[in-house]
């Protein structure tokens, strides 16, 4: 699907973008991979590692629609990974978060339309479901924008989808590198916000592969959610440092005890497939009549029961300490 195609990744110098680039280069023969991001140093460092002839690097901000549109010329597929995602920082700088996560999302949509992009997938987060913090609220708004974009496409062929998942093991700013840094510095204890806290976990590699597969299965308008394991934060801390004690510091601004990826309010829109769930659009598209119970590959899903929810504390899949360490070690080697 990606052979001889032009692919653009916003926020491409981040953990996801670099892994996505690695997977594309190892498994496909793209015509161009365009990395679109703000930080010239990160682009310089990434270019020293990913220097294949097909690589292109564009300095730009998703807030700048003109620059974004210029970078998207002749692009076939877009992955929108750029975001302001640090929860407490977003709480203290709300308008900056809104400019990047909401205005930036609309700029991506407009640039896709202007350049005839075939498909665009936006990365979302479990924090967008029943949000209690500004980051989650902006990502919910972003999700809504990308879903609704399919309805305003008119005679344009661009299709938009959303991929929503939980904490990415090893990604920049996540708890795993934070804990490992404390351990390497000789910490005597690890800070835990609440002993009851649970989270969804996915490796960078699995996250990338899930997004890749969604390009093939999407009609346009779906929110795709992978079936991934949960784990208690205390189990993670014990797995990384079994001999260290834990210090309870309390929940930070905007945090939840448990994350939700599908709320019961969306159960009537949700279909279960073998390895994932798909939330169909809540609005009826004017000129499209897709059957979202069957994906674009012809695979059939089943409607979930009314009142179904998918939360990190009611998840049937739980990662053991051994399994999580395997994910962490594999991610570092990847």
Swiss-Prot record:
The keyword Glycoprotein does not apply. Disulfide bonds: none annotated. Substrate binds at residues 85, 167, 175, 193, 252, 255. It comes from the Bacteria. InterPro entries: NAD(P)-bd_dom_sf (IPR036291), Polysac_CapD-like (IPR003869), Polysaccharide_Synthase-Rel (IPR051203), PseB (IPR020025). Its cofactor is NADP(+). Coiled coil: none annotated. It is an enzyme of class 4 (lyase). NCBIfam families: PseB. Belongs to the polysaccharide synthase family. This is UDP-N-acetylglucosamine 4,6-dehydratase (inverting). It comes from Campylobacter jejuni subsp. jejuni serotype O:2 (strain ATCC 700819 / NCTC 11168).
